[in-house]
Amino acid sequence: MPVSPAFNPQDALRFLPEIILTVMGTLLMVLDPVIHKRSSNAFGHISLIALVMALGASIYAYGIAGPAFGGMLMVDGFATFFRVVVITVGILTVFPSYRFLARQDAETSEYHALLLFSIAGQCLMAASNDLIMVFIGLEISSIASYVLAGYLRDDKRANEAALKYFLLGSFATGFFLYGVAWIYGLTRSVNLSVVRGVFQHQPVDPTFVGIAAALMFVGLAFKVSAAPFQIWAPDVYQGAPTPVSAFLSAGPKAAAFAIFLRIFMTAFEPISDKWQPLVWTAALASMCIGNFAAILQTNIKRMLAYSSIAHAGYVLVALTAHSETGVAAAMFYLAGYAFMNVGAFAAVSVLTGKGERYQNIDDFKGMGRKQPLAAAMFTIFLLSLLGVPLTGGFFGKFYIFKAALDSHLIWLTVLGLLNSAVGAYYYLRILVVMYMYEPGEAADAAEPLAPSLAFALILPALGTLALGIFPGWVLEFATKSAANLK
């Protein structure tokens, strides 16, 4: 469908979530000299207001869905779904950040501004229908995330995490951009709809097409921490502040998968035979490396990092299915994953104590008695990550493996189920430590649960259970959005 390049006033309304987040992020930095440091929680309140406004704007924009800015953006159900997911991740990240920033006596305005800028980039990624816009959104999100990872400037682990994240992330972005250059050279366009049309109706050298797809796959696989490009994730998740680790594990990953799905299921859909074997291999490698490496970990944050690699593999299984059902399953899974993983890291933020001193799994002995609410919420998140019924994780995995079976991916489904069984060991090990051992030093040093941290635990737990008990409405919207993804 041809799209007029002329400006339409509705374009600004369709772009409203990104405008709100950018303006409010800038406002936070402008207000920094004005607001007294003792009132630093005000920056968190402003950040929450901005995110709620952006959430409302995303829902409003869906009511006037359509292309914007000459077709560079596409505000549809797919974009709205992922906008809501990444903004929700931002809201859930703000709550544990209150206590973290107060404990560290860190600057709050810059932290929340970077958070808003990163989410703005992720929203742009979700709505992009043009490879240049994808790149811009990717860079906005990534640059802010690099700084957040090293936000504690006096912490050597945080500095190391930020440096590794920046260097490897820049390298991966180079691969992605080089792939974009190949696509432009082959099709004379960076618009996804036009690229799809060229691949469908014009002869293109299959070797060059395969190279372009592989280059872009490498760049995106890094962003979602999929094997064999996952090496950065454990060090970054361990070294970054725990609320930042929660954010990085869910928000940027969901946005990157939105790009993955939109590019590979629209522009690259006619050449699926070129990329399906690559995605199949990455899915299996991610599940195996993530789950088996997680078994060996003693640090809770590194364990969750390897767990996130395995979960990236599950989503890649849905992409390998190459079907509307697979896309819908991936969308549902990422929504559930956002709740359970942000919640898990929020629980870790509580249970590791002041300064995150107690990060070893053995330090969690007896936490079920000393921190009953945090331990109970952590249990819900771990069971959801495992895929136990009545949680969002169960239905997420069920829909993914069903989509894989429908596409006759028998071996990948079997291997995925076996990997899920392997995951039971390291998730249940934490529950055993928390509930079946006498309290240790960390449990004895436990502090009262702050209201902001209680919210950070209860809200994602409710989301996780809601998706496990009433999955239909989210899956229905995801299915409708996937059907319109062209």
UniProtKB/Swiss-Prot annotation:
Family, similarity comment: Belongs to the complex I subunit 2 family.
Membrane topology category: Multi-pass membrane protein
Subunit comment: NDH-1 is composed of 14 different subunits. Subunits NuoA, H, J, K, L, M, N constitute the membrane sector of the complex.
Enzyme Commission identifier(s): 7.1.1.-
Entry GO terms, CC: plasma membrane
Role summary: NDH-1 shuttles electrons from NADH, via FMN and iron-sulfur (Fe-S) centers, to quinones in the respiratory chain. The immediate electron acceptor for the enzyme in this species is believed to be ubiquinone. Couples the redox reaction to proton translocation (for every two electrons transferred, four hydrogen ions are translocated across the cytoplasmic membrane), and thus conserves the redox energy in a proton gradient.
Record organism: Solibacter usitatus (strain Ellin6076)
Main location: membrane
InterPro entries linked: NADH-Q_OxRdtase_suN/2 (IPR010096), ND/Mrp_TM (IPR001750)
Name of the encoding gene: nuoN1
Transmembrane segments annotated in the record for this chain: 15-35, 46-66, 72-92, 111-128, 131-151, 166-186, 208-228, 241-261, 276-296, 303-323, 331-351, 375-395, 410-432, 455-475
Compartment(s) of residence: Cell inner membrane
PANTHER family: NADH DEHYDROGENASE (PTHR22773)
Record-level Gene Ontology MF annotations: NADH dehydrogenase (ubiquinone) activity; NADH:ubiquinone reductase (non-electrogenic) activity; quinone binding
Keywords on record: Cell inner membrane, Cell membrane, Membrane, NAD, Quinone, Translocase, Transmembrane, Transmembrane helix, Transport, Ubiquinone
Record's catalysed reaction(s): a quinone + NADH + 5 H(+)(in) = a quinol + NAD(+) + 4 H(+)(out)
Name of this chain's protein: NADH-quinone oxidoreductase subunit N 1
Pfam families listed in its UniProt record: Proton_antipo_M
Family matches, as NCBIfam families: NDH_I_N
Domain of life: Bacteria
Biological processes per GO annotation: ATP synthesis coupled electron transport
